[in-house]
Amino acid sequence: MSITSVSLYVYLICAGGHAKQVIDIFLDNGIEIKGIFDDNKTGQFYRGTQIIGVISDITKYQSEPFFCTVGDNQIREKISQTVGNVEWINCISKLAYISPSVVIGKGNYVGTHSKILADSQLGDFNIVNEGATLTHDNIIGDFNHIAPNVSVGGRVKIGNFNLIGTNSTVNPDILISNNIIIGSGATVVKSLVDPGIYIGTPCKKIIKNISDKCTCFPDNKPLYNEYTEDKSMENTENNKQKIPCFVLIYDQVDIIKKCLSFFTKYNSRLDIIVIENFSQNTNETIKPYVMNLLNKKKIWKYYLFENNIMNNAYHMALQHAIKTYLDPKKYPYTLITDGDLTIDNEDWIEEQINIMESNKNIYVSSCSLDTSNLPTETFPEATSWTKTGIDRGNYIEDNTGIFSLLLKTVDVIDLMVFLDSKNLRFLDSLINHYCYNYKYKIWARTKKSKAYHLTWDLYKDLDHPYTKMKRENIYLWSQNLTCKFDLFEN
């Protein structure tokens, strides 16, 4: 098959993050994007491209040139098998180097500054991402994702459905079979035959199956399989069931008191779970205050971590909750929020639930932001919150940070299974990526309810101790931190 496309135009499937890279390469190669098919988005997308229909519409476009932009290997395979008899073309950057002796199949992505060297073979529907190098005599199967800056030595054989993480190295003469995930920065020094997740240098297997990491009930069935098709949400009475509400707090006593005073007003609707990262104010002030709320039954549970592990506290608390008490049959919805918010609409819970139930393709609803105290002068990156999103009638399609995130509990469990399987952490950017690029669903935010971000008031003062702490410890957000915690509960 020809390495480069002879088509003058192409249709794309799915409008996610990887699609933007694909669009850049096709347009740089002079290939017109005739339209994009996506089940969850409409209208204009990136660089003037248009979403013109849903995936089922592709049956009307048989024999036309197509490219699937999905990053997930399994979903890419499913789409390739269900859209009918289209012509799958390759997307190859002009800035990639491919030896004339290389044999390439169909539906492959080869990104900028990547290299495929002498006598190598690349099957179908693979992603060779930016800066990756496949040296001589490699044999690559189908539906693999070779992430940016991966280096693969000579005579390596890679099967199907593998993910080789960013900046990984695969030594020469290695076999990587099927359904293997290699973590970022790993070094593969011997062949990997058993499916699973491998990390480190040299890489070692850390988990056998995706579902092993996050199981809950005594029969040990993975929740991912047991509850994904749960129909209990169809009963509108579930709207009145209590909602577990995870609130993460840290250090700032006045802000914590304002936030928890706000949320505890709704404890007839919320089972409030406070998560605290230990700080200098914990023992003297914060812990006594939170324990008083617990004793008065204004909150349900209190996780106290012995160190400041940033957003990993969400991750560890949710892991524990899923294994012990977060039952989707009892709690159809779960709320997760930062502990520095107040919300200006007393009906904010109902608004978020109504948004979730108005469209089955909505994955998460969150509160919009009150930007009146946005610290744009001291934190220029905060300007990202000024974006307006797309007005969809009763909601705005757009993401936020972790500002009152409402999800179906089954989706929280599904998300945690995914994050654990990829050795990732609970971050808003990763939730957004999973929402759009794996679930093909929508992140919605409220039109009426707005969250006031109390910490932003502090960020306006660069000399404030909390602002300095955030600046000095910003690197911690990228660290996989863990520690022990105490759990206090009613």
From Swiss-Prot:
CDD domains: LbH_AT_putative (cd03360). Pfam families: PglD_N. InterPro entries: AcTrfase_PglD-like (IPR020019), Nucleotide-diphossugar_trans (IPR029044), PglD_N (IPR041561), Trans_hexapeptide_repeat (IPR050179), Trimer_LpxA-like_sf (IPR011004). Keywords: Signal. Residues 1-19 form the signal peptide. PANTHER family: ACETYLTRANSFERASE, UDP-N-ACETYLBACILLOSAMINE N-ACETYLTRANSFERASE. Belongs to the mimivirus L137 family. This is Uncharacterized protein L142.
